[in-house]
Amino acid sequence: MVFKAHHRSITRQDIELEDLENAPASIASIENDTLEANVGSTPLTAKQKRNIYFLILLYLIQGVPMGLVRGSIPYFLKPNVSYSDLATYSLAAYPYSLKVLWSPIVDTYYCRSFGRRKTWVVPCMLLISSTLLLFSYNVDTWISKGSSYINSFTTWSFLLVFVCATQDIAVDGWSLNMLNPEQLSYASTAQTVGLNTGFFLSFTILLVFTSPEFANTFIRSIPSNEGLITLSGYIKFWAYFTFIASVLVCFWDESNHQEIANISDMWKTIRAALSLKNMRQLLIVHTLGKVGFVANETLTLLKATEFGLSNEMLSLIILINFPLGLALGVYTGRISNYRPLDIWLKGYWGRVVSILLNTILVYMVSNWKHRFPVFFPIFLCYTLNASFSTIQFVALGVFHSKISDPHIGGTYMTILNTLSNLGGSWPQYVMLRMADLLTVSSCSTAPHLTCSADAQKKECQALGGTCLYKRDGYYLTSIVGIFLAISICVSLITPVVRRLTKAPISSWHIHSKIAETYT
């Protein structure tokens, strides 16, 4: 049966007498409770290692569908859609940015005999499995129709991301109970390895093995028009794999069971958490921290493919970067125990440099593509961008794990991750639409063709014409992004990061209001 705890949650207006009596001790403990304290490294037990591998598996299950939605599907769609269609498709990622709305339900309602987290993880995995299986029978048709089916793609992807986001709430909360407080940085490492591996499989590996050119060049002796695998077959495989993994989760021991507040109190807890001064300042970092990057990072590789970079070469670039990303993620997780936001800030400035290099690269390739070597400059720019993105992602994950209140672990981590995901979702739609609206192009022999999609460009070439760009929205949005990234960081983000780095960990917890009120 479903169990719902009825303990009272603590807010600024609702403080228990026994808490006030213990407040002086709490105040004294805060003195050494700071993010600058390096917790050191404690050896992992065999059970904790198993838990880390288990977390990697759960995050892998999330990473595979997210790699499809955020990685390979836009590339399969690109020949038949415009930037505006891609902007519409980007809305599918919004459940990750809105999951805080239903996180209290995930944290509050569960089957006590089955397990607080397994109650949600197992059904979510089964839904992911069934959704992938159904989609595998329609994906080829939707891709071939392009813009005509963009709404179907977006709707399916939205539902899939919604289920993944719900699972993420439960897994984030579960990770806080699997490891000791001084080892929580491993949770961020597990998340990085799992999500990156899933994304890598659904992006790089998928693009390579669905490519007929790759198979004909390196593997087959007799050429064929099909790759080694099909997109529908790949999706079907992961549907079955996820189902099998869900059976494993059913038998996994879930310890450290905690009874929690009812859903009404959980909503009050969210409101109390969002009312924290630190949280309001962190909101600035999250909502504005990716404004300058999303459009450039999304469009640069797509522009490179327009100028002759094949999907095979793109996959090779990402393939080479994959082990680097994993190693860098593990290393960043270790060094981020001490002042993780400082590490994040260094990654921010690195990304500013990388998007500037991206813009210069695209300009050079577009003007001298017959004399300019495409692969190595793109490889360098992608490596820089991916490395700094990984540094930011892992450092922020460590920071979230350190400041999260274990009493409401799933909900608190969801609040933090929601703020982070929202910062990457809302500017993407705006900037992609801007890039499309600012682009003015036409075909030299058929002015009615706008060359907004690859299919129109091929049609223009078939008519004996070339695409003429009076204005390319890519450069304008990139320049605007660079300006926003620098100005926002200097005026807002850097001062906030300096303040948050010095804040005690207890000041992030709801119960810290007890000591604050007592004093």
Swiss-Prot record:
Chief location bin? membrane
Which of UniProt's keywords are assigned here? Membrane, Transmembrane, Transmembrane helix, Transport
Would the keyword NADP be found if you checked this record's keyword annotation? Answer: no
Q: Which InterPro entries match?
A: AcetylCoA_trans_1-like, AmpG_permease/AT-1, MFS_trans_sf
User: Per the record, GO CC terms?
Assistant: cytoplasm; Golgi apparatus; membrane
Q: Name one GO biological process term.
A: acetyl-CoA transmembrane transport
Q: Which GO terms describe its molecular function?
A: acetyl-CoA transmembrane transporter activity
Q: Where in the cell is it found?
A: Membrane
- Protein topology in the membrane: Multi-pass membrane protein
Q: SUPFAM superfamilies in the record, alphabetically?
A: MFS general substrate transporter
Source organism superkingdom: Eukaryota
**For this UniProt entry, which segments traverse the membrane?**
52-72, 86-106, 119-139, 156-176, 199-219, 231-251, 313-333, 343-363, 374-394, 408-430, 477-497
The name of this protein is Uncharacterized protein C21B10.09
Q: Which organism is it from?
A: Schizosaccharomyces pombe (strain 972 / ATCC 24843) (Fission yeast)
Q: What is the lineage of its organism?
A: Eukaryota, Fungi, Dikarya, Ascomycota, Taphrinomycotina
